């Protein structure tokens, strides 16, 4: 199973794909979330080496960590403040 959830442009040739996936070991099915960089290869995009796969149960903690990183980036002036982003 693979369900593409989002595609985020990274550059003119690359994109980040976020998907729900699963893989099976001997007797266990593991539900995963994947964020992987895909690169343009002719008319298609192919998966690159860069990315992350984590158990779907870790998704809330990962989101919390990314939100903390966003807050820190805004506080450091690396991203516009929420007020500026809304305008």
State each model region's role.
Residues 52-87:
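Mixed-charge, Lys/Arg-enriched low-complexity segments
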Residues 15-50:
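A short, structured beta-strand/loop element
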Residues 9, 19-21, 57:
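A structural detector for beta-sheet-dominated domains
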Residues 6, 22, 80-81:
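Generic detector of low-complexity/intrinsically disordered segments
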Residues 1-13:
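Negatively charged, low-complexity tracts enriched in Asp/Glu with abundant Ser/Thr
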């Amino acid at each position: 199973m693979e369900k593409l959830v989002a595609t985020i442009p990274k550059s003119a040739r690359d994109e980040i794909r976020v998907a729900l996936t699963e893989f099976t070991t001997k007797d266990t099915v593991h539900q995963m979330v994947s964020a992987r960089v895909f690169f343009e290869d002719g008319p298609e995009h192919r998966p690159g080496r860069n990315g992350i796969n984590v158990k779907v149960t870790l998704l809330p903690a990962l989101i919390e960590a990314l939100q903390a990183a966003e807050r820190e980036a805004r506080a450091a002036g690396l991203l516009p403040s929420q007020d500026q982003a809304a305008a």
